[in-house]
Every structure is written in structure tokens, then in C-alpha cells.
A protein has these predicted regions:
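Accessory alpha/beta interaction modules
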Residues: 1-148
Length: 148
């Protein structure tokens, strides 16, 4: 397997951000004010996590965009590179991590509207988890995210 290169993925996503949003979020795309450049907040996002826990097999992009009505929104792109999808433990870890990104961004920037997309590169078409669920004595939480 070729060596994973975080910077290549980040540059690719930055360069292709607009067509990626058009493809993955066709309803959101025309609402974005593209005359204003998206602000990429990877460094701020990385600071929300313990560096020892951040792996080298995924890339996280947090972009702040403005809609045509002037409101600010956030788009979280998570690229999962190879190796996942082999078992139930991987799935639960991945789903929980997606939820953790969501609630930390929501808490840090005090925002409700976050569009999240997980891009999986593992090649296993049957492994496409799209939600994190937990329940304890009648209290239930379900977080659903986009996956490609």
C-alpha cells in the first residue's frame, strides 16, 4: 500500500472543494456565496483533540462558508484512508469519532448547522456506516451523517 500523505489529501480537497460540495451536497451548493472564499480551519479542528489519539489514516477538513443570506455555516469533511471496515469494533470507533467531531465543532464555534461527510476509501462497498447511536435506559441519541 502506498504511504499515506496527509498534505496531498488536504491540498486535493482544498483545490477540489467547490466541485466536491456540488457533487456531495447538491442542495447546499447553490445556497453558498462562492464570491467569499471558504475558510479552512483544520488547525483549529486538530487542536480540539488529543494529538496522541489522532491517527495517520484520516484527514479532517473543517470549512467555514457563508450562504447567500449572509449566515455562516460549517462543513466537516472526514476522509478515512484504508484499513477500516474490517470488523464491528472499527465501525463503532469510526461512528463515534464522527459524532465526536460534530459535537466538538458545535461546542467550540457555538453552531448548530454542520454538514458532515465521511469519504471512505477502503473499497468495501458493504461498509458504509452513516450513523452513531447510543441508548441508555430510555435516553437515546442518534447522529446521522453523509457517507461516500
Amino acid at each position: 500500500m502506498p504511504e499515506f500523505n496527509d498534505e496531498i489529501w488536504k491540498r486535493s480537497i482544498h483545490t477540489l472543494f467547490r466541485p466536491m460540495i456540488e457533487f456531495h451536497f447538491p442542495d447546499l451548493y447553490p445556497l453558498i456565496d462562492w464570491s467569499r472564499e471558504p475558510a479552512f480551519l483544520e488547525e483549529e479542528l486538530a487542536n480540539l483533540f488529543d494529538p496522541k489519539k489522532v491517527g495517520k489514516r484520516f484527514v479532517d477538513i473543517l470549512a467555514q462558508v457563508f450562504l447567500l443570506d449572509g449566515t455562516e455555516k460549517y462543513i466537516l469533511l472526514h476522509v478515512e484512508v484504508q484499513g477500516y471496515g474490517s470488523g464491528e469494533e472499527d465501525t463503532l470507533e469510526f461512528e463515534e469519532r464522527m459524532f465526536e467531531y460534530y459535537y466538538r465543532v458545535r461546542d467550540k464555534w457555538k453552531v448548530k448547522d454542520i454538514a458532515a461527510l465521511a469519504i471512505l476509501t477502503d473499497g468495501n462497498e458493504k461498509y458504509r456506516p452513516d450513523r452513531y447511536e447510543t441508548s441508555f435506559f430510555g435516553t437515546t441519541l442518534t447522529y446521522v451523517f453523509n457517507v461516500s
